Amino acid sequence: MVIIGGGPIGLYATFYAGLRDMRALVIDAQDELGGQLVTLYPEKVVYDVGGYPGILAYDLAQNLIEQAKMFSPDIRINEWADMIERTPDNMWIIKTDKGGAFKTKTILIAAGIGKIIPSRLNAKGEIEYENKGVYYTVRRKRDFEGKRILIVGGGDSAVDWALTLSPVAKSVTLIHRRDQFRAHERSVKQMFQVATVYTWHELKEVKGDGSKVTQAVIFDNRTKEEKTLDVDAVIISIGHKGDLGNMVKWGLNMKGRSITVNGKMETNLAGVYAAGDIVEQEGTPKLALIATGFAQAAIAVSVAKKYIDPNASVFAGHSSEMDNKFKK
């Protein structure tokens, strides 16, 4: 089975495929596994995954990666699943942007919202200092200890980063181009207590010494008055978009950016399944939850196992009865 997507649902599907004695190949367009857990909110706590009263998103991702690797799958990151072709013997060939070509009987699409691409301001110096002081998310809170931080944005993520970093940073300043915030009211009130906030302000320029950020120029978008701030880091948190690449051209039945599946997680293409945030399941409310995606992944893998081997059972039993698989 080829699993497209290395986020939490793809990782769990990889584990479950191994549990069902299926060889798995994971293809992910990001440069690391973990999906949104590591790309968007690694330092935030996830509360709605069974068995964890609360766990850092990054830690949950690492646990899922460890679990996924239990049955030694092949993993290819920073690689797009670009095209699929049907063969005369009813197999699929998946071609990637790196020249890879993989033949498989089944495909599970767990691509989430697609490759996550941060929205950029294109301010002067922004690209030059990307990853040298300009960031679009917070991977590790400790990287910002003792630093003077400027956050750009007015949504939940921007406000949450201000609250998260204020205990460890030397200072936190947040600018927003309006005076109304698209964040939880309570969080906004807390932010004003721990950060310096400039409303009606935007980022004009990021300055540095060539290797790191040293200053940011902001301006009042009503008066055009400029201020130069001494900063060590600029976090631009104005949203992101998901890129599905050429997947939209594969002939899948889609509703908007979602792939339509039935109760068995089957798409309209034989041997192709989907699970997680990317699916729109017929007759079922869409819940964009990790917990929901886990169940969908298990169903998809189990149905795919039966498709590969008609003599196989859809339900192979409980993992607690499979100690031999885990004690090798």
Curated annotation (Swiss-Prot):
Q: What is its EC number?
A: 1.18.1.2
Q: How does it assemble?
A: Homodimer.
Q: How is the cofactor bound?
A: Binds 1 FAD per subunit.
Stored Pfam families = Pyr_redox_2
* Disulfide bond annotation, renumbered to this chain: none
Protein name per Swiss-Prot or TrEMBL: Ferredoxin--NADP reductase 1
What cofactor requirement does the entry state? FAD
Alphabetized, the UniProt keywords read: FAD, Flavoprotein, NADP, Oxidoreductase
Family stated for the protein in its record: Belongs to the ferredoxin--NADP reductase type 2 family.
